[in-house]
Amino acid sequence: MERVERIIEFEIARINSHLPRARKSLKDLLNMEEPMITLRDGSVHYFKRQELELLASLLDEEEIAMLRLPMVLEISTVERDKIIIRGKVEAKVIRKILGFEEAIIEEPILKLPRYYLPKIRRILPTTTVHAFIVEW
């Protein structure tokens, strides 16, 4: 069984090769002439400036410095019908983008039905990325 688990983990790592090696703050990306990051597979991912500016318009200065991009939308093997967004600022942005009311308490984890994934990706195609998470 251990061999099968290693194979599955290898395949998940392969399908997640589009994830960033490191994320950058919205503030740093806004200050770059060509906002970009390097992905795990060595390729470069470019951010659309108008998308970065949209995100900045939703946040205050402190939050702009805190928001790390791209935001990771997790797809879990356990909660297959949900996507998970981690981070207080990230969750706030997604709630605003989807038109949800302000939360009374800002939670650091936001779980949404998976059918929101295409809508989020359509609105924020370069500042979000989905990741497949294996949980046993």
UniProtKB/Swiss-Prot annotation:
Pfam families, sorted: DUF61
Among InterPro entries, the record links this protein to: UPF0216
Coiled coil feature spans = none
Q: Which domain of life is it from?
A: Archaea
Q: Which HAMAP family match?
A: UPF0216
Q: Which family does it belong to?
A: Belongs to the UPF0216 family.
Its protein name is UPF0216 protein PYRAB16100
